[in-house]
Amino acid sequence: MKKIAIILVVSLCCLQSVLAQDGTKMEAENANYSNCKLINDKKYSGGKALELTDENARINFSYQAPERGKYTIHVGYDALYGPKMVNVTVNGSTFSFQTGNTVMEEAEVGTFFMNQGANSIVITPSWTWFRIDYIRIEKGGSTLEFDIAANPVDTHASDAARTLYTFLYENFGKKTISGIMTGDMTTANGNVTQHADVQAVYKASGKYPALVGFDFMNATGKSGNSSWNKSYTTASIKLAEDTYKRGGIPAFTWHWRDPSRRTDAFYTADCNMKITDAMNADGTWNTSSALYANIIKDIDTVADYFLSMQSKGMACVFRPLHEASGGWFWWGREGAVPFVKLYRLVYDEMVNVKGVHNVIWIWNAGENDRDWNPGDNYYDVVSADIYNNDFDYSSNYVSFDKLKTLTKGKKIIALSENGPIPDIEREFEEEAVWSWWMPWYQTWNGKFVDKTSTAEWKKCMNDSRVITLNDLAGWDVYATIEIPTATNATRQEIYDLQGRRLFSVPSKGFYIMNGKKFLK
C-alpha cells in the first residue's frame, strides 16, 4: 500500500501504466486529450468519459510495456446514437473498428505489437458522436495455429488449379507474392511486361510483379456488348494469358454492373439494384423472374471467359463480390444474408453448372464479417483490402490476425487491394506474411505505385522472401500427379512431363514438382 500511495503522489499517469500491465483499465479522462468533452456520469468507469463530437478529437494514452511482444487492446465505449467507426493507432499503425448498437460495451480491438517501454495508443474518430470510457490492455494474443487444407475447395479442380493452389499453399507464411492491379487497356498489345501498370512497378523496383490483377467490370451490364467494353475485356484476357504463360498469376476482380440493366453502375448510390428483387418472399430464388435471368446471364458470361482460359490449361484466382460489408456496392446493400446467397449462386453456377474448375476462389472479408462468410466450402483464400496513408509500410498485422481468427486458421490470407506495399521485414517480424499483396493501378490517374517510395520498392522486390515474375520459370515446369493406390507396392514411380523417371515416393497423394524440388 505504501508503494501505491507514493505512485499516486508522484503521477496518476504512472499509475495508469502500472495498472494496465496487470490487465486493468486506463481511464480516458486521465490520458492526454484534446477537442473532447469531459462527461461526468456515474454509469462510466471512474464516473467520467470523453465525448468525441469533433472530427479533430484525440485521446493519447501512454502505455509502459514490460517487454516487447503482443498485447490485446480492449476499448470501453458508449456508442450513443448507433454504430460508429473508431480509429486506434498504436505506435503509428492504425486499425479501425466499428462499434455495436449497444449503448455501452467493451470491444476487443485487436492484438498489437508493442515495444518494451513507452508506447503510444491514440484514439480518434472516423465517425464522430461517441464516448470513450477506458481502454484495457492484456499481455499476449491469439494462440490459434493455421490448419489449412492441402487441396482447393473445388473437388474437381483442374490440374492447373491444383498446381496454383499448391503453389499458394506451400509458400504461405514463407514468402509473399508481389502483385499489381491493371486499369487502362489501350497499350501493351498482349505483352503483360509492357503494360503501363506493370511497367510502373518495374521502373520503381527493377523487377516485374508475379501476380497481375484484371477486372471483368466491362464484361457485363447495360453496355456490356458495346465494342469498347468488349475490346477492354478481350485485352484483359490476352494479358492474363500472357501472365500465365510467363509463370505469373492472373487475379480477377468483378465490378459487377447493375444486372437489372437500368444503369451501368455498380455503386449503391448510383443504382437501385437489390438482390432480393430476384427472390421469393421466403428468400429462395425466383427463377422465373427477369432479374434472376439477367443475373444468371451475367454469371455465365464471366464463366465462359474462365472456360476459354481453362481450355488453354490456365488457372486464375477470382475475387467476386468484393468489399460487400462496406455497403458501397449493390451486392452489399441489403446485408449479409442476401450476399451469402448471391456468392453461393455465383460459385454453384460457375462450378457445378458451367464446369469452371480452373479458379481459386477468394472471399474478400472485413475483419468482423462472420455473418458474411459464404461457407468454408465456397472459398480457398480470405482477403482484405487496406489502404494505408502514402508511404506507410505497416504490415497490417491486426487485420491479418482478425482474418485468421475469423476463418479459424483454415484459410490462406491475402492482401487483395492496397496502397503502399507492406514492408517485408515487418511482415515477418510481426507475423503477418500475406500470401500476396496487390497495389491498385498506376494508370487512370490512380498513381498507387507512387504511394511506395522507390527505395522501398527496391528493398522488397529484391528480397528473397518476395516472389517476383523474374523468379518464376513458368507453369510448365510444375507437375501435379495423383499417385494411384497400389495394394502390394510400397513405393510409386514419378515421371516428369516428358515421361522420364525421376524417382519414387512411398505413398499416394498429390505432389508438385518445381525443378528439383518435390513437395507433397
Question: What is the meaning of each model-derived region?
Answer:
Residues K222-L345, V356:
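Substrate-binding cleft of extracellular glycoside hydrolase catalytic domains
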Residues D369-F391, W440:
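Aromatic- and acid-rich polysaccharide-binding/catalytic face
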Residues A479-K520:
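C-terminal outer-membrane/trafficking sorting elements
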